[in-house]
A protein has these predicted regions:
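Selective transmembrane helix interface/packing segments
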Residues: 1-362
Length: 362
């Protein structure tokens, strides 16, 4: 498996040794390029997800989806982006202008920050701290603040009600989400995202294989809680159109609305990417202990494995959204506090016992 850190080391040596750049300038150039790469990747994946959502929705409803703009509707997303860019950005007269303008920025900052923790390949993780799981959950929580400020700052009763629903839902489901991540940390022995993936390299080393029953339970609870955390159907009570028009971003237009729309889709990918990283091996290929098979699998680039797993989980979550009816807010909270969180907590205890007694697959 190719180690992408070789490329970064070569580029650093190119700047400092070959071109003679001082260390501070080399670091600055590298940070700018990495930041630009994150934003480009963020935008490209958002475009793919928006197009994918429309097509998946259409096929589940026996339709074709967008077909007019470009071949097979491939340019529809770009047309929508152009339309959104040229729309006027207006602020409601009685809105709290500071909160109104800061809210979409907080939502997009939390989304981009969490996106930066995903390990794309061996040695290709932008933010790779030894407490990565902890920082990931902390940064992703910024979005909750942004959603609440959007509702409060809009001075709209529907937006406020939507923001309250969204905040209580996201805070509640973060409990189960974190418990599932702690379950994985107990088994792998590290909170570093790259370390979690490296612990899953080898025959039958993916976490759902190593940790068997408790790891599989944690995986499914994580997907359900993550779907609710991203405000996706059937947990999209914060944007219930029949009750709250457009939810907390009712009063937003242009790129203000675009930031919320963009963050929603990328949060879906982030949840899928974290699940793929923590439970399905991330960029690690599937190895079964047969030399010929494993050798072929190892030839496939790690980024292909990661994106394949992540987009497969995205498709599963989209399938769930367009299959199940929307839950009421009381049903959503009941599912979390009466079922998912006790199950995740019990599962954490079981995983602790499994690891302590050495009952996992080594």
């Amino acid at each position: 498996m190719f180690d992408f850190s070789i490329v970064t080391q070569w580029f650093d040596q190119l700047l400092q040794l070959t071109l003679g750049c001082p260390e501070w300038l080399a670091i600055l150039i590298e940070c700018v390029l990495v930041g630009a790469g994150i934003l480009v990747g963020y935008a490209l994946i958002a475009i793919v997800l928006i197009f994918m959502e429309r097509k998946v929705c259409a096929y589940f409803q026996c339709r074709l989806g967008p077909m007019r703009v470009g071949y097979w509707g491939l340019l529809q997303v770009f047309a929508d982006v152009l339309k959104m860019l040229i729309k006027e950005i207006f602020i409601v007269d009685k809105a709290d202008k500071v909160l109104y303008l800061v809210a979409p920025l907080l939502v997009i900052i939390g989304s981009v920050g969490a996106f930066s923790f995903l390990p794309w390949n061996n040695g290709a993780t932008v933010l790779d701290f030894n407490v990565g799981v902890f920082l990931l959950t902390a940064i992703s929580s910024i979005g909750v603040v942004g959603i609440f400020l959007a509702g409060w700052g809009s001075n709209n009763k529907y937006s406020v009600l939507s923001a309250m629903r969204g905040a209580v839902q996201m805070i509640s489901y973060e409990m189960s989400l974190c418990l599932c991540l702690i379950t994985a940390v107990i088994l792998t022995g590290t909170m570093q995202m790259s370390g979690i993936v490296e612990a899953q390299t080898g025959p039958w080393k993916w976490l759902i294989f190593q940790g068997h029953i408790p790891a599989i339970i944690a995986f499914f609870v994580f997907l359900i809680a993550g779907n609710a955390e991203a405000n996706r159907g059937p947990f999209d009570m914060a944007e219930a159109e029949s009750e709250l028009t457009a939810g907390h971003h009712t009063e937003y237009s242009g790129m203000g609305f675009g930031f919320f729309y963009l963050a929603e889709f990328l949060n879906l990918f982030i949840i899928a990417g974290i699940a793929a990283t923590v439970f399905l091996g991330g960029w690690a290929p599937v190895n079964i202990g047969i030399a010929a098979f494993d050798q072929v699998m190892n030839y496939i680039p790690g980024i292909v494995w990661f994106l394949g797993k992540a987009f497969f989980l995205v498709w599963i979550l989209m399938w769930i959204k367009w299959t199940f009816p929307r839950l009421r807010i009381d049903q959503i909270l009941k599912l979390e506090w009466k079922y998912l969180m006790p199950l995740a907590l019990l599962n954490l205890v079981i995983m602790t016992v499994v690891v302590a007694l050495g009952l996992y697959i080594k």
